[in-house]
Amino acid sequence: MAGLYLHIPFCKQSCHYCNFHFSTSQNNRDEVLTAINKEINQKALGFNDKISTIYFGGGTPTILTEKELNTIIENILKKFDVEKNIEITVEANPDDLTKSKLSALSNSVVNRISIGVQSFIDKELKSMNRAHDSKKAIKSIEMARKYFENISIDILYGL
């Protein structure tokens, strides 16, 4: 059993707790997406394990357009041998989740969404420089439940 993790290094803003590689500038977006697809092509050569899970993390994968995300997914599905019931997860920020974004994700092969809530306490969210508040977090979870059966949320402890 093998899995793929793809790091999408773009964010709208910098969250104070985050130590992952990301950029709030998207000046090189096309080049980065081209490089991701080239790396997929390279890694697939001679890779014989069957892929059971694909995880898009970040950064913020939902910053990508439907076309950009689907291009990457289609490339993976063409280049790698994947399980029939593969789990494909996309991380999302609550402020990115609209009905149209959730609909597009659920109509693709994405079958799990992981929402970066981090906290339901507005004071903590503000201190982390998160773009959403607790009401938006709850609303995003409620909306996601209409489109996905498999949902997880990230919560930071001990803030």
Language model: regions and residue ranges:
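Conserved non-cysteine loop/helix-boundary elements of the Radical SAM core domain that shape
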Residues: 22-46, 51-159
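Canonical Radical SAM [4Fe-4S] cluster-binding loop centered on the CxxxCxxC motif
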Residues: 1-31, 126
